[in-house]
Design a protein with these regions (language model features):
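Haloarchaeal acidic low-complexity proteome signature biased toward cell-envelope/secretome components but also
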Residues: 1-25, 61-81, 127-131
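Membrane-helix boundary connector in multi-pass membrane proteins
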Residues: 91-112
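Membrane-helix boundary elements
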Residues: 19-50
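Hydrophobic alpha-helical transmembrane segments
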Residues: 38-43, 107-113
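Generic alpha-helical transmembrane segments
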Residues: 40-62, 117-121
Length: 131
């Protein structure tokens, strides 16, 4: 990260690795218990961990006071997408996938429902959360 990024965002970025690991473990074992499907559990765990890894620094950047640093949206190297919306969409989508898998055995329908939930979450959250 750039020198202009607040230390709290840097700290959150470092901690997001650990948080992502524990989120992955929790989602994997929880989904495995609920569905009994190893593939869906692995997919849900990986994608949810990535979502947590993206969302945690975004959340920390929202708390950066004016003048103390630059938030993620203002740093040219971070890209032009909405970190909060992407992170939350990557968390909600897999959780919906697991929920649908509990009642539906067709994996294409299950993955489609999760993908649709992620897309809807992204669009809604992008409009609600600050950049």
């Amino acid at each position: 990260m750039s020198e202009e990024v607040d230390e709290s965002v840097r700290r959150a970025d470092r901690w997001s690795r650990v948080i992502g690991l524990f989120v992955a473990l929790g989602v994997y074992f929880g989904a495995l218990q609920l569905t009994g499907d190893i593939a869906i559990s692995m997919l849900a765990a990986a994608v949810t961990a990535i979502g947590a890894r993206i969302y945690v620094p975004y959340h920390a950047s929202l708390r950066v006071a004016e003048g103390r640093g630059t938030n993620l949206a203002e740093i040219p190297m971070t890209g032009g997408y909405h970190y909060g919306a992407v992170g939350l969409a990557l968390i909600v989508g897999p959780l919906v996938t697991v929920a649908v898998r509990m009642v539906e055995t067709e994996s294409i329908l299950t993955l489609g429902a999760g993908g649709l939930a992620a897309a809807v979450t992204f669009v809604v959250v992008r409009a609600v959360l600050p950049q």
